[in-house]
């Protein structure tokens, strides 16, 4: 009974003790930096810039977090994001007009990312390749595809797409707001749904989860 309560508690709590300590340390470091470098650090422009840069790594960390909670690891995350960005940039550069081009670029990027994730999942779940080895090989594949698509040169969007990244709502960068929204949605999924509980259980013990009737693949 105690073991069951302990497991349920560990599943439902969003942060363990180590995570809380890490958050406290980061907050203290930010506070100290803000005091010692107040003129350079604590200004609106710098905070907005940090928010924009945090979005990119934050979104990747959300996906990586779910992967690690399930007991795996994904070394190809950065290269998948790179391939998605190149794909979106090429769509925008293809002279697709107006907002339709931006929407199409976003859809293509999401589809490319989903296909890469499905391929990684196939390697791990159905071919039984260890996650580290599978994603170590797939990141080379994604990097090669990115180089071929970009022809080894920089792919950048035009001003239409840059407008979105420069938009702010009450001084908060729009990309950072989207990141917060994704964080809230993923938190609710992982803590309030059966899917989230299954991910935690599979990450804790995949074999026991399989015997419990959970499809670990």
Report each predicted region and the residues it spans:
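Transmembrane helix-bundle core of multi-pass membrane transporters
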Residues: 9-13, 127, 131-193
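Alpha-helical transmembrane segments within multi-pass membrane transporters and channels
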Residues: 96-138
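Membrane-helix/interface signature in polytopic inner-membrane proteins
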Residues: 184-217
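Single transmembrane alpha-helix segments in multi-pass membrane proteins
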Residues: 30-35, 43-95, 122-128
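Hydrophobic alpha-helical transmembrane segments
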Residues: 20-24, 50, 58, 79-83, ...
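Membrane-interfacial amphipathic/re-entrant helices at transmembrane-helix boundaries
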Residues: 2-61, 96-104
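Membrane-interface helix caps of multi-pass small-molecule transporters
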Residues: 66, 90, 115-126, 149, ...
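Hydrophobic core segments of alpha-helical transmembrane domains in multi-pass membrane transport
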Residues: 22-35, 64, 110-113, 139-144, ...
């Amino acid at each position: 009974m105690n073991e069951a309560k302990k497991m349920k508690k560990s599943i439902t709590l969003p942060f363990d003790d180590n995570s809380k300590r890490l958050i406290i340390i980061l907050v203290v470091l930010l506070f100290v930096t803000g005091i010692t470098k107040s003129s350079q650090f604590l200004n609106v422009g710098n905070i907005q810039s940090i928010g924009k840069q945090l979005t990119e790594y934050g979104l990747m960390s959300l996906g990586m977090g779910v992967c690690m909670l399930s007991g795996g690891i994904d070394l190809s995350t950065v290269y998948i994001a790179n391939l998605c960005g190149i794909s979106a940039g090429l769509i925008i550069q293809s002279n697709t007009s107006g907002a339709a081009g931006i929407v199409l670029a976003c859809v293509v990027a999401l589809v490319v990312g989903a296909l890469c994730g499905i391929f990684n999942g196939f390697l791990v779940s159905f071919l039984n390749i260890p996650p580290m080895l599978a994603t170590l090989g797939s990141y080379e594949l994604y990097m090669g595809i990115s180089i071929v698509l970009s022809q080894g040169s920089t792919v950048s969007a035009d001003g239409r797409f840059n407008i979105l990244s420069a938009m702010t709502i009450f001084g908060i960068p729009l990309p950072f707001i989207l990141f917060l929204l994704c964080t809230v949605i993923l938190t609710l999924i992982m803590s309030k749904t059966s899917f989230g509980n299954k991910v935690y259980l599979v990450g804790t013990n995949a074999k026991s989860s399989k015997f419990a009737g959970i499809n670990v693949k």
